[in-house]
């Protein structure tokens, strides 16, 4: 076979002309050192703050310290296989997590990967974990209730949609129980719930998931878990991941509720990362930006107006407001609310529910201290009937606590003081509620109505809860229309009150409640 040199040169020219040279420009660096999940990298001159970095073995990290001649990064997950001299590549992307309806009912890790053994999650959308909170113009005032189903909270420290209400207390005071009741109570309301577990034992998280499944709450809940055995970096980013998942619903004109359990452990994880990155320590060895750590997270919980929702959905959703309500949890040490992290979060949130060990041990559960628990914006969002009937509850409890302290020293009490003490005892007893036995608006209104009109004046304190339960059952069977009317209108008419007065008289004549 004879080869023609001209043909060969033409072929080579054609190949050169058709050659596509699309060079992928990605900055590469070299690992200098690896210690405790912190990697120092040389040569990443173009790295961004918070950028995802790719390590060998399909491992990712987060660029956190951008120094003159090196980058300090934190590894998201296992780091044992990373060694000195390994090549690190910039991805050019900020850390993103999957978002969407497909996540509802699933348990995922801090990066949105499923860990419940139910197969992959087929989401098409992702969103960055760090976002700027809605501005002043984009927001709408909080005026819709987020019912928790707990008498003590909904009557004294009401929570509104788009509010941030802190749950604070020592270990083992029922903080998680209050949050789980709030999640269970959203069943059938269309509110999507996100439960973020930070630094808890895997067995505790499994227990929470099991309880939510038992009460049919997993159907509207996403669980984001960063267990105690996982890297500090994952515990640090878990709340931001959960918040991004909640914002997906908020920005589409829906309502979402997010529980951070708990932010004390996130602050500890962040302190660990910061100290390993050699950032200067401040008070209690926390870094200087620990306030910003929580403020930028909690400011993202808000109620956004119709225009903002319309803008975010490109006109798909019109005339609807969206909200993300946050229930952050903080664990105190020996009731010290003046420590660094508790005071920070108290100042960021719109009120706090303070749970006390002494009340919990005395059997008053939820163990809410009515004196220092407040809701700064929830009053405007309270249901009309609960606002009207529950106004005297906080006052009755506060006066009772004060008088109870004095009555220990006084041997003879006048009639008015004795009556006030008895009333306070009954109110304290009726504010008790078992876990997962939430009440709707009408059932709560019924109890508050009975307290206000003196129906419990002749009921022994020990029998008050049984009396309440029996009377509720009596009204449910004999006068269901009253409960339906209150639930529908959010108010109690004079006609309903007359019906209830007659029902109470009839019930008392047939029910043996006296001691």
Curated annotation (Swiss-Prot):
The keyword Cytoplasm belongs to this UniProt entry's keyword annotation: no
Residues binding ATP, per UniProt: 169-176
Domain of life: Bacteria
Site (Required for activity): 373
Record note on quaternary structure: F-type ATPases have 2 components, CF(1) - the catalytic core - and CF(0) - the membrane proton channel. CF(1) has five subunits: alpha(3), beta(3), gamma(1), delta(1), epsilon(1). CF(0) has three main subunits: a(1), b(2) and c(9-12). The alpha and beta chains form an alternating ring which encloses part of the gamma chain. CF(1) is attached to CF(0) by a central stalk formed by the gamma and epsilon chains, while a peripheral stalk is formed by the delta and b chains.
Annotated family: Belongs to the ATPase alpha/beta chains family.
Protein name per the record: ATP synthase subunit alpha
Native organism: Neisseria meningitidis serogroup C (strain 053442)
Classification lineage: Bacteria, Pseudomonadati, Pseudomonadota, Betaproteobacteria, Neisseriales
């Amino acid at each position: 076979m004879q080869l023609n040199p001209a043909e060969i040169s033409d072929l080579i020219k054609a190949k050169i002309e058709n050659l596509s040279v699309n060079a992928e420009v990605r900055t590469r660096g070299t690992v200098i050192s690896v210690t405790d999940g912190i990697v120092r990298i040389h040569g990443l001159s173009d790295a961004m703050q918070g950028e995802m970095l790719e390590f060998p073995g399909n491992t990712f990290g987060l660029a956190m310290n951008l120094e003159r001649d090196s980058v300090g990064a934190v590894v998201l997950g296992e780091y044992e296989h990373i060694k000195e001299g390994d090549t690190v590549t910039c991805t050019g992307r900020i850390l993103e997590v999957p978002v969407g309806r497909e996540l509802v009912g699933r348990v995922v890790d801090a990066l949105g990967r499923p860990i419940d053994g139910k197969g992959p999650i087929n989401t098409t959308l992702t969103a960055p974990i760090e976002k700027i909170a809605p501005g002043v113009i984009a927001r709408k005032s909080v005026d819709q209730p987020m019912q928790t189903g707990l008498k003590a909270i909904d009557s004294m420290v009401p929570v509104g949609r788009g509010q941030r209400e802190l749950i604070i207390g020592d270990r083992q005071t029922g903080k998680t129980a209050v949050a789980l009741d709030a999640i269970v109570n959203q069943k059938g309301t269309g509110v999507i719930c996100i439960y973020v577990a930070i630094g808890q034992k895997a067995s505790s998280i499994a227990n929470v998931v099991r309880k939510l499944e038992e009460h049919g709450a997993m159907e509207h809940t996403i669980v984001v878990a960063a267990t105690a055995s996982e890297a500090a970096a994952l515990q640090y980013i878990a709340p931001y991941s959960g918040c991004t998942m909640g914002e997906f619903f908020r920005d589409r004109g829906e309502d979402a509720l997010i529980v951070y359990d708990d932010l004390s452990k996130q602050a500890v994880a962040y302190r660990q990362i910061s100290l390993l990155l050699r950032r200067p320590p401040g008070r209690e060895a926390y870094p200087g930006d620990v306030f910003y750590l929580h403020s930028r997270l909690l400011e993202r919980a808000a109620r956004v107006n119709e225009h903002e929702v319309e803008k975010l959905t490109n006109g798909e959703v019109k005339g609807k407001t969206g909200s993300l309500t946050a229930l952050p949890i903080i664990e105190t040490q020996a009731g010290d609310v003046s420590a660094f992290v508790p005071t920070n979060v108290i100042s960021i949130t719109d009120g706090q529910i303070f749970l006390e060990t002494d009340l919990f041990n005395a059997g008053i559960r939820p163990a809410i201290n009515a004196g220092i628990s407040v809701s700064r914006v929830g009053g405007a969002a309270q249901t009309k009937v609960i606002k009207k009937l529950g106004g005297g509850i906080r006052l009755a409890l506060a006066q009772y606590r004060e008088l109870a302290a004095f009555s220990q020293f006084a041997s003879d009490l006048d009639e008015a003081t004795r009556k006030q003490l008895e009333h306070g005892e009954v109110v304290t007893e009726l504010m008790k509620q078992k876990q997962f036995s939430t009440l709707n608006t009408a059932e709560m209104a019924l109890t508050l109505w009975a307290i206000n009109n003196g129906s419990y004046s002749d009921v022994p304190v020990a029998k008050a809860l049984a009396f309440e339960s029996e009377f509720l059952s009596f009204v449910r069977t004999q006068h269901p229309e009253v409960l339906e009317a209150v639930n529908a209108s959010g108010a109690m008419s004079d006609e309903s009150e007359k019906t209830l007065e007659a029902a109470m008289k009839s019930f008392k004549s047939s029910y043996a409640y006296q001691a």
